[in-house]
């Protein structure tokens, strides 16, 4: 009988080496360092973690996105970063969700996916009661006060609201390059992370196959106990060195190319959108992200369904219509091709991949940065004490993130499956049964007869909780049939629903009266700052 718990611990994990900078590398470094006291200050004579980030001076980081989820608030707060500094230094604004245009029919339809759950969602599922008057009011209007804020470009808080506190939940829109620089400076100056500029030219292995050290062109050999691959789509460690297979998901998610641009506002006081705007096109969709000084606008599309020239024409037509003809004429476009999918596993031996090294799909629901947050948080929380138990931690990590990727793919594909558009092969192919994961097909069948709620998302830390599925389903016009069986819980919900709908309407009117515009709040924060909690 093997009782490994009584064995003498072998090599302790005291040194972490992160390969790659950018948002993924520095966010990972900061999250781990904030938890493991990597600032040279040991606690009770315990050894502090040594964290080194190796970044190539020759590689331009793509930036995993300009939109975050609300989880970023607590992530930055734990790292000790001031929200005022974030707004001032990263050209950041507040994001309250996503506004989807032309996804349902392509005929000027619109709906939102707010970050705030439906009113009283913890105890009451209002979706069945809303179904009874679904033709009178949009689902998000009936159950969420945030929907109105998003359509009117209002802020989720006031200048008197402290840092990271809110009246309506929010994430951020930000400049990815400036955000990475803020993280780098904070990690080096405040969290004690060693930053080395060098190219990795060789990877040296130990007898058991672990990575022993990295050979660089200017900094010699760099040793470590755990290596984190944040080298982007190159996947230098997990992909090139360990040859972990890549699992393409292009059979489900067709988009594989993005055309990105940065567009200035016509006027300095133009409204800053409170949501990411996602406008469906013939073979993809256009994102539109409002920062204080510019808009980030891009077109993500399927190269199997359209050409780069046609996609570029649609992007420029959008800019011409929503910004100005002059902006369309002067816009510079950058092309980014990607293979939608992820590695077969993410943690192998003493190497774990985070960010694009682990995988990448279209930025439809801003999943890239939140995956970095969740990956780094799990590494920090379950960092193995020694090499002996690392494989157990790796097994748990891989299972968790394979599940997460499956759920992300289901959620993103749902947007396409529910569309009524049939104006191109792209939309027709997206509704074909062969392009829909079986797990999603089963859920859609289930939801025809019962509304999503807590038990439909089985993990407490789901990326997309059941509330998110409700917003997309009912925003896209999906109908859940009423049960013919009388239930006690239904009668109780019926009696409570009228009051809850009324409470939401009253709260909506109150927030519309109190909340400043996004731009008004950003300007005040830039001038005066927010209160620290």
What function would you assign to each model-found segment?
Residues 60-151:
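Dinucleotide-binding Rossmann-like beta1-alpha1 core, especially the glycine-rich loop
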Residues 330-335, 344-396:
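A conserved active-site cap/scaffold subdomain adjacent to cofactor or substrate pockets
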Residues 110-182, 186-190, 230, 242-245, ...:
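Low-complexity, highly charged intrinsically disordered N-terminal segments
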Residues 162-284, 289-298, 302-311, 376:
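Predominantly flavin-linked oxidoreductase catalytic cores and closely associated redox partners
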Residues 14-46:
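N-terminal Rossmann-like FAD-binding beta1-loop-alpha1 element of flavoenzymes
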Residues 34-64:
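Glycine-rich FAD pyrophosphate-binding loop
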Residues 381-533:
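Long, low-complexity C-terminal extensions of enzymes
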Residues 281-337, 359-370, 382:
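Conserved FAD/dinucleotide-binding core of flavoprotein oxidoreductases
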